[in-house]
UniProtKB/Swiss-Prot annotation:
Methylation at His residues by METTL9 enhances complex I-mediated mitochondrial respiration. The modification Pros-methylhistidine is found at residues 5, 7, 9. The gene is NDUFB3. Coiled coil: none annotated. This is NADH dehydrogenase [ubiquinone] 1 beta subcomplex subunit 3.
Amino acid sequence: MAHGHGHEHGPSKMELPDYKQWKIEGTPLETVQEKLAARGLRDPWGRNEAWRYMGGFANNVSFVGALLKGFKWGFAAFVVAIGAEYYLESQKKDKKHH
């Protein structure tokens, strides 16, 4: 069997994001670094936590927001379920009367 025709079936190599894209400037981590620097210390892993303050992860989640997160889709599913139940019950009643 010939190999190397672009039809690999094994796991592909995962691409890791570039660590340089995460910056602590403008995040609460910057304050931590400044306080550590005042004591002559440095957090070499601070950049690893910067993703928490960027992009979609940066939004503050309120208690109400957490409770209502899936409400839209849940309510839509509820309406569909009630509609299906109503339809199936009406079909069952029609069969009993005939």
